[in-house]
Regions:
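C-terminal motif of bacterial Sec signal peptides marking the signal peptidase cleavage site
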Residues: 3-7
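A residue-level marker of the well-folded mature domains of exported/periplasmic proteins
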Residues: 12, 18-302
């Protein structure tokens, strides 16, 4: 078989890491606050909350403190992808454990600096956080500084590592495996003209791993079926992980030139690709969470 690749920018491969050690929920058994702090929703065992959509985006204790904090990655909180999926997990745990919680978005938005991220973590601690969940590998420098300063606070680094600090738990993923399965499934389902558009401008290790796995999975399926597969891939328009007219135009162009399905790998970028797919009667592969609820163009999510 022959696998054709058409590149539109991007570089910097990264090696996948294994999932980190202890989960952040170990803080729950050590609480000594007054009972008033347990007045978060769903404290009754028989009324467990199972949908994050049923929970408010923040819940405070009677003294105005928040025990669990979530510091967002770049992009929107409600990105229907990485940020939202992570925060939904935080909310579900907190609500069912009777803990107060709050989210923090670093100042600067898509242009947030390490100082902006540190300031968000510092504010979370000042507001009473005992556990701070930080999403995205870009949090590394700020988290290292905050964890060394606030040694009594536990930090959870999603898409990161423990950095040799006792109060940091790293949680990493093998994105290449999800990407591989998505590429393999797409080709086995009959798609032979694929696209991949990744967030982070080629510097995001997680998106890189998704992309490499996607190509390898498509290659393996093509060998099984004895078919030729062509793949367009691009890191353009995805540096901020945001939806954009430019990305939608690029995706529409790919579809018009024969691409059948595009793996939209990067937060709100999905919205642009899905809009193009809908207009061109084409297909999309989602990422991070099940995005089939967002568009009937989605054939699977990785």
């Amino acid at each position: 078989m022959v696998l054709g690749l058409c590149a539109c920018g991007g570089n910097n491969a990264a090696t996948a890491t294994t999932a980190a050690t202890e989960a952040p929920v170990t803080e729950a058994s050590a609480e000594t606050e007054a009972p008033a702090e347990t007045e978060a929703p769903a404290t009754e065992a028989s009324a467990a909350v199972t949908s994050a959509d049923d929970i408010a985006d923040e819940m405070t204790s009677s003294d105005g403190k928040y025990e669990i904090a979530f510091v967002t990655d770049v992009g929107q909180l409600k990105d229907k992808s990485f940020n939202q999926g992570t925060f939904d997990g935080v909310k579900l745990y907190a609500a069912n454990a009777g803990k107060s919680y709050k989210y923090y978005q670093p100042a600067g938005g898509d242009q947030a600096t390490d100082d902006d991220r540190y300031d968000a973590m510092k504010l979370a601690v000042e507001n009473g956080a005992k556990v701070v969940v930080c999403a995205g590998f870009m949090q590394g420098n700020a988290l290292d500084k905050a964890a060394k300063e606030f040694t009594d606070t536990r930090f959870v680094f999603i898409d990161g590592w423990a950095m040799g600090l006792n109060n940091v738990a790293g949680i990493a993923f093998q994105e290449e495996q999800c990407g591989y399965l998505a590429g393999y499934a797409a080709v086995m389902d009959g798609y032979t003209k694929l696209g991949f558009t990744g967030g982070g401008g080629g510097a995001n290790a997680a998106c890189n791993r998704y992309g490499y796995g996607f190509v390898q999975g498509a290659d393996a399926a093509a060998a099984v079926k004895g078919v030729k597969v062509d793949i367009n891939y691009s890191w353009l328009y995805g540096a901020s992980f945001q939806a954009s007219n430019e990305l939608q135009t690029m995706a529409a162009g790919w579809y018009q030139n024969g691409t059948e399905v595009i793996f939209a790998c990067g937060g709100s970028m999905f919205q642009s690709v899905a809009a193009a797919a809908s207009a061109e009667d084409a297909s999309v592969i989602g990422v991070d969470v099940d995005q089939s609820f967002e568009s009937d163009t989605v054939i699977t999510s990785a």
